[in-house]
Amino acid sequence: MATIHIESLKEDIAPIVLMPGDPLRAKYIADNFLTDVKLVNKVRNIFAYTGYYNNKRVTVFSSGMGIPSMGIYAYELYKFYDVKKIIRIGTCGTVNKNVKLLDVILATSSYSLSTFPLLFDLDTGKEYFSSVLLNKKIKDVALAMNINIKSGEIITSDVFDPYVDHEKFISNFPDKRFLASEMEAFVLFYLAYKLNREASTL
């Protein structure tokens, strides 16, 4: 069963999806970390691959950049492909002095001024949360691999904030102490909440 934006059959997609923004990063992950890999989507050059990691079937599916693109792919994967868990794996920026280059951040929630929830279902929430259970699994694996993780709230923005005035950007969030800013996690967490699925963001 294909959708408007995804050509895959339902059985092509694993219940667990890793979701980088960049299609070429999805290809890199598939080429270097998965075995028995199959290309399952290339519509609009949004590449997706399904294969095995440590004998666990997983799909790596690129989201593109920004809330609208993530909203399309996360919704279709959750709704029509019966995906249970999506873990966004991507880059972010920060103005937090405690966060250093190459630190790994696990988002416990995302705050945004996006109108996506309002337009989607008249929801007015500005903050949505990642899966506590999925986050615990991620932390447990990181601990076992001796990888330090910083966890906390992030901001999801509709603009690429390095291009705008820093002080003006920060003034939109006067009461927030966030670890990082990025452009996709908010809608992923929102759709997981609406569709009773799980989501995390690294």
Question: Where does each model-flagged region fall?
Answer:
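Glycine-rich beta-alpha junction loops
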Residues: 23, 93, 155-160, 187, ...
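Active-site rim beta-loop-alpha module in soluble metabolic enzymes
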Residues: 127-175
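Zn-dependent metallopeptidase/amidohydrolase metal-coordination segment
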Residues: 186-202
